[in-house]
Amino acid sequence: MEITITSQTENVLLNRKEIGFSITFTGATPSRKMVHAKLAAMLSAPKDQLVIGSLHNRFGLTEITGDARVYTSAEYLKKIEPEYIRKRGMAGEEEGNADAQDAPSGDAAEAS
């Protein structure tokens, strides 16, 4: 998987950098978690301050285009980004916790 930065804009008003990127890959389509980790390492940004906005994969091609945002602090990210974007666009514990909270416990499933 190779990531190429296509555009980078500083948005001072929202305390973030807006990044456009392109990914070329072979084999299976990379997951959001893989893209998030590699993009964070590439930009030297903390993972809790980076959110992936969108990923667009064209049918039949091994290329993805997308956009991401890097905030100056995690507080700004939580203040500006909607919750569903934070859960979808950030890799890590937040995704696992949301799944664990939605899953019914074993006792409740047996009682039904």
Curated annotation (Swiss-Prot):
Keywords: Ribonucleoprotein, Ribosomal protein. One of its GO terms (cellular component) is ribonucleoprotein complex. GO terms for molecular function: structural constituent of ribosome. One of its GO terms (biological process) is translation. Residues 88-112 are annotated as: Disordered. It comes from the Archaea. InterPro entries: Nucleotide-bd_a/b_plait_sf (IPR012677), Ribosomal_eS24 (IPR001976), Ribosomal_uL23/eL15/eS24_sf (IPR012678). Pfam families: Ribosomal_S24e (PF01282). Belongs to the eukaryotic ribosomal protein eS24 family. This is Small ribosomal subunit protein eS24. It comes from Methanospirillum hungatei JF-1 (strain ATCC 27890 / DSM 864 / NBRC 100397 / JF-1). The lineage of its organism: Archaea, Methanobacteriati, Methanobacteriota, Stenosarchaea group, Methanomicrobia.
